Amino acid sequence: MGIEGVSTYLKSGNMDTISAPPGFVSQTSFVLRNVPRDKESPRSVSRQEQTTGFGTDDKDSCNMFLKSRPWIVHGHTIPSSEALRPKKTEVRRRRPLKVSETKVLEEAPVFNPTEEEFRDTLSYISSLRDRAEPYGICCVVPPPSWKPPCLLKEKQIWEASTFFPQVQLFGIQTENRKIKKEVDADSNDAASEGVQLCRVERGPGYTLKSFKNFADTYKKSHFGMKDEVLGSENSSPSLKPNELIVADIEKEYRQIVESPLIEIGVLYGNDLDTATFGSGFPLSAPSESSKYSSGWNLNSTAKLPGSLLSLEDCESVCVPRLSVGMCLSSQFWKSEKERLYSLCYLHVGAPRVWYSVAGCHRSKFKAAMKSFILEMSGEQPKKSHNPVMMMSPYQLSVEGIPVTRCVQHPGQYVIIFPGSYYSAFDCGFNCLEKANFAPLDWLPHGDIAVQVNQEMSKTSLISYDKLLFSAAREAVKCLKEYGLSKKNTACYTRWNDSCGTDGLFSNIIKSRIKLEKNRREFLISSLESQRMDKSYDAVNKRECCVCLGDLYLSAVNCSCSANRYSCLNHMRKLCACPCDRKSFLYRYTMDELNLLVEALEGKKLSSMFRWAGIDQKFCASPATTSSKPEEDKGKETDEVTPCNITRKDVAAGTKDQTRVKARSLADILNVKDGNNDAKETLESCSKKSNRPCDNDSSEANAPKKQKQ
């Protein structure tokens, strides 16, 4: 076509219809480079005119010609080699907020129980909840009579037990450095967002004796060398280690966190397993220490009657943990795993200063942490990577987040409430022991923790559903015994307050059953149903292969992978097999779960007996005694039994069991109180009938009354 053809085509007015020839459409954009114009003779033809047919002065026609080519990117030039290099994100250090030296945090409440109040651990803590939970933390000073022996001072532990502490390095050289945690990586730890980063490394081995010697020497040298390092102009009056008080050490801690001038390193022994290292409390109850076997002995706190952890056998939450600190060693911001309660006792040593943000301000705290890490590093914090950081509680207070301060001395307890974030630092060598527990009011917090873990695909340390239905088993048992004997026991009092039509525990069970019902109706209605075998989770708890959620109540399995399960929400992500090859596994039917609600509401004694029989026969918990005859014991099967058992068979059991039950109940039941409900249960359970026990007619019961 040539230059003349292009010019003719342009003059004809067909500029908008120009398109690339077939096969010449560019798949990528390219950039036109501006070429400098040299001085040329009038006769010479520019390179631009040779290639496009336009002169340098005909700019409008040239622009129209180029705009008809959609593969050309306009308004760009070829960048220089330096511009092509990837730019590093500019990281600016956050300018420390000017916190007034006179800024005072709100103090946590301190309680002094009497001998009588101190006797029942969980009841006393429950009485403090309304007053102390808004602070997130509180301190309990035991009565003068409570002086348990510190077994950590015994020679076999003090000089023989070895541990490997963390080396915490913070200061100028560690700013803006992200270091992953080498200890328990807890997504709930707020150590991932803060103002001052800290490096954590594994330290050498120490005994308590050698660690104390190192801690005392370090404390003397640190405050003795402070004036020499900072200079006489910037230094404060010289402080001797034996004259230091908590306020002096806290001032030094604030200096390190908010505006460090030197780099320092300290040691901190965190989360030492007392089952291996040794506990400060006596494990047994000899004659001289029998009075220290109460719930305030942290070896028995998790398993106290009324703590749901007594129904769980998980060492990671049931075994107390030991912490060994030194001057300026820090516990970084964190929240307890599964949002459990914590009870901390300071055995020996210097005081510890705690800072806490209550669970009601949890969202504000997390938002402030994210903004701090974004401003410091220029990138969003990742859920899986948690760098170790510290944040000044006084700066949090300036941001509008209420922070509580608590000073714990040796021989005192500190209670951390569910959902609270907390941090701490030590004023010198000390040994602190911590135990978790879960009273009934923890269940709403545990439910939230389960949902958060599933969203983050994180394994839960405990099975929430197992705890929930194990607690239901205990509640029905206590209510049933009271219905028979009319004896007001401590167990009945505890469960009677939370059960009933509008009780806390009853409402939690109803909510969980409603959620399970909706999932079964809308997600797995087309799958074949099978009841779980007792060997399903006899060894290990089952988890969803996608979200790692607990599968105690229901699960989905496929024939292509026998040991692979998923929750109902992630059924389609289990495998690529069609639905006809997948099976829905359940522990209880919906009718049986509705029967549990009736039993907890306490309206009918017959519902309690029927649920107890169902729960004993099909509960896969190893702690539950099997109701099978003796000849069936010892038989094991790896297959999941199909759902071919009807409700009448479940309620009936064997004839021998029915006769034994009838003889035992006949001696206990009162003729006037509750006799009708009990007889209805026994009579209906001895029949092969599909009718519920509470629908039996009065005519069928009349002749049996005459016989009795």
UniProtKB/Swiss-Prot annotation:
Tissue spec. comment: Expressed in inflorescences, roots, siliques, leaves and stems.
GO CC, alphabetical: nucleus
Family annotation (PANTHER family): INACTIVE LYSINE-SPECIFIC DEMETHYLASE JMJ19-RELATED (PTHR10694:SF54), LYSINE-SPECIFIC DEMETHYLASE (PTHR10694)
Family statement: Belongs to the JARID1 histone demethylase family.
Single GO MF annotation: zinc ion binding
SUPFAM superfamilies with a match to the protein in the record: Clavaminate synthase-like (SSF51197)
JmjN domain sequence ranges: 108-149
InterPro entries: JmjC_dom, JmjN, Znf_C5HC2
Disruption-associated phenotype: No visible phenotype under normal growth conditions.
All residue ranges annotated as the JmjC domain in the record: 293-454
UniProt short sequence motif Nuclear localization signal, positions renumbered to this chain: 646-653
SMART domains the UniProt entry points to: JmjC, JmjN
Lineage: Eukaryota, Viridiplantae, Streptophyta, Embryophyta, Tracheophyta
BP GO terms, sorted: regulation of DNA-templated transcription
Subcellular location, record wording: Nucleus
Keyword annotations of the record: Metal-binding, Nucleus, Transcription, Transcription regulation, Zinc, Zinc-finger
Coiled-coil region(s): none
Compositional bias (Polar residues): 43-54
Segments forming RING-type zinc fingers: 544-581
Organism: Arabidopsis thaliana (Mouse-ear cress)
Basic and acidic residues: bias regions: 678-694
Region described as Disordered: 35-59, 678-708
Positions that bind Zn(2+) 2: C558, C560, C575, C577
UniProt binding sites for Zn(2+) 1: C544, C547, C567, H570
Name of encoding gene: JMJ19
S-adenosyl-L-methionine is among the record's keywords: no
One Pfam family, short name: zf-C5HC2
Identification of the protein by name: Probable inactive lysine-specific demethylase JMJ19
